[in-house]
Curated annotation (Swiss-Prot):
Organism: Spinacia oleracea
Quaternary assembly: Component of the chloroplast small ribosomal subunit (SSU). Mature 70S chloroplast ribosomes of higher plants consist of a small (30S) and a large (50S) subunit. The 30S small subunit contains 1 molecule of ribosomal RNA (16S rRNA) and 24 different proteins. The 50S large subunit contains 3 rRNA molecules (23S, 5S and 4.5S rRNA) and 33 different proteins.
A GO BP annotation: translation
Region forming the signal peptide: none
Main subcellular location of this protein, as a coarse class: plastid
Lineage, broadest ranks: Eukaryota, Viridiplantae, Streptophyta, Embryophyta, Tracheophyta
Protein name: Small ribosomal subunit protein uS10c
UniProt keyword Iron, yes or no: no
Purpose: Component of the chloroplast ribosome (chloro-ribosome), a dedicated translation machinery responsible for the synthesis of chloroplast genome-encoded proteins, including proteins of the transcription and translation machinery and components of the photosynthetic apparatus.
Residues passing through the membrane, by range: none
Keywords of this entry: Chloroplast, Plastid, Ribonucleoprotein, Ribosomal protein, Transit peptide
Protein family (similarity comment): Belongs to the universal ribosomal protein uS10 family.
Molecular function GO terms recorded: RNA binding; structural constituent of ribosome
Localization: Plastid, Chloroplast
Gene symbol of the encoding locus: RPS10
Length: 195
């Protein structure tokens, strides 16, 4: 009996929402509640609902049922405040300051050692570190003729592989920047810093 009452409570707002869906402007909150109703209502492949089935149980969280009991008009009234709160949350999540360090080298052990030095310097100043992220290796292939004049079939193929790493330092302090400036990185590593 409890199963049919839950599915009836889920189906009745769904039919009301479909009847009043002539407006083209829909909010994110109403769409998410509509998707929630669809996921909570069991359906067969033919599209018929299983609300009359006696051996099927539907479970829902209490918070989901409270969302479904509210009327669609209340979603439209509160949509402006929810959009503002989402924008405020995204501003808080994005760091205001970030140092992006991109390292390039032809030799992998050299670039790995440089990454370790940068990460150790940032950790000592309690800065948050993201990385090192290995970027795709760039291969430049050069084709050179073996002979100086003829015999174009005989060639040498040389390649240069450029390995890259990316490190982000979030919320840097002045002490973090000072410790990064004092690092003595090897000469075979190209360092590009963006603030």
């Amino acid at each position: 009996m409890a199963t049919s009452s839950i599915s009836a409570a889920l189906l009745s707002p769904l039919t009301l929402r479909n009847a009043s869906s002539s407006s083209t402007k829909q909010d994110f909150s109403t769409l998410s509640s509509l998707n929630l109703r669809r996921t909570l209502t069991p359906t067969l492949q033919s599209g018929h609902t299983l609300s009359n089935s006696s051996n099927f149980a539907t479970f829902a969280a209490p918070g989901a049922l409270e969302v479904l009991e509210t009327s669609p008009d209340s979603f439209e009234d509160g949509s402006e405040t929810s959009k503002i709160s989402i924008a405020a949350d995204s501003d808080q999540m994005a760091p205001k300051q970030k140092i992006r360090i991109k390292l390039r080298s032809y030799w992998v052990p050299l670039i790995e050692d440089s990454c370790k030095q940068i990460m150790d310097a940032a950790r000592t100043t309690n800065a948050k570190i993201m990385g090192p992220v290995p970027l795709p290796t760039k291969k430049r292939i050069y084709c050179v003729l073996k002979s100086p004049h003829v015999h174009k079939d005989a060639r040498f193929h040389f390649e240069i592989r450029t390995h890259q790493r990316l490190i982000d330092i979030l919320y840097p302090t002045a002490q973090t920047i000072d410790s990064l400036m004092q690092l003595d990185l090897p000469a075979g590593v190209d360092v590009e810093v963006k603030l």
